[in-house]
Amino acid sequence: MHKVMKILLIILAVVAVVAITTMLVLRHPAFGRKMSKERKARIEASPNYRDGMFQNEEPTPQFSRSMPAMLWDFITNPPKDRTPKEPLPAVKTDPKNLPTDCDWLVWFGHSSYLFCLNGKRYLVDPLLKMEFPASVMMKPFKGTDIYTPDDMPDIDVLIITHEHWDHLDYATLRDLREKVHHVICPLGVAEYLEYWHYDPTIITEMDWYEATNGITCLPTRHFSNRLLGGRNQTLWASFLVEEGGRKVYIGGDGGYDSRFGRVREQFGEVDMAILENGQYNTDWRYIHSTPEGLEQAILDLNAKAVFTVHHDKFALAKHPWSEPDSIARSIAERNAVKLLDQPIGTIIFF
């Protein structure tokens, strides 16, 4: 009996430690907070919020196979070459001293990039500082983490496409706060930013098809979930930025659907389309861009130039790390597409 009681006490102690640790971890600001009643009311009034959550425009299963089938495939077909053996080439540009009298883009790996359009500087989904808890989930490839928030200039517009950890980073946004003049984000995402001490007066939350100051919020085919907030309680989006007669399409994350053709119909030819390419899996084809979906999206948009993102920094899927670059080049060659294919940090004029 004494031994049984001792074992039970040990088990209870372990459970208590785990529970307390979990509670403390979830109190980290990166996890966000409960949404305000006012924000929740606006979300529930959205035509895209139905049956207790945001919905995609087309039916969107999260996975194309059952979870047991995916787990079995992962066990029997383990991924190979997910990370590079050598540091990736990257260029250390000084974003603070880049000109604003011409249009350019500098990519920081994955889906983080800074671009200038008609004198305005736009920063998209910056992930420039690996701190807990993001550092537990993602490890940057060697050579790809050469930029920090300190390297950034003043930002005219910060654009966040959705709440996922690889797009909405607490540590980066905390350190950028004093440099940001205006924030554009989908419905619900501002709850994080306000919790992280961003001035609510500089934040514009948008629903699909709303527009402000030359920026139109548009659909993508994805989802949201950041643990505490619940599934699909904040919106995900793509954006069309128009400035000085030029147009940039920010595709965000999402599986292929008819939206790319509709962007072309509504806005005409865009000067640059920035599209997701990487961290894909056939099991996720409804919520992430596959190589086949990327090619069709490029054809539907028929943009003057294409730049692909969501690769070359983290291994978040099974495919070889170098595959997205090869696929993009093959698509461009096959379809006579102008592909802006440059290493991290390169100044790309467009």
Roles of regions detected by a PLM:
Residues V18, M23-R42, Y49, V157, ...:
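Cap/insert and terminal regions of metallo-dependent hydrolase folds
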Residues L128-D145, S224-G230, N281-I287, A315:
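Acidic/histidine-rich helix-loop elements
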Residues S112-C116, N213-E269, R285-G293:
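Catalytic core of the metallo-beta-lactamase
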Residues S46, M137-I184, G268-I274:
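Active-site metal-binding motif and surrounding structural segment of the metallo-beta-lactamase
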Residues P126-L128, E163, T220-H222, G252-G254, ...:
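Active-site metal-binding loops of divalent metal-dependent hydrolases
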Residues H2-F132, M137, I146-T148, P186-I250, I327-I347, ...:
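Metallo-beta-lactamase
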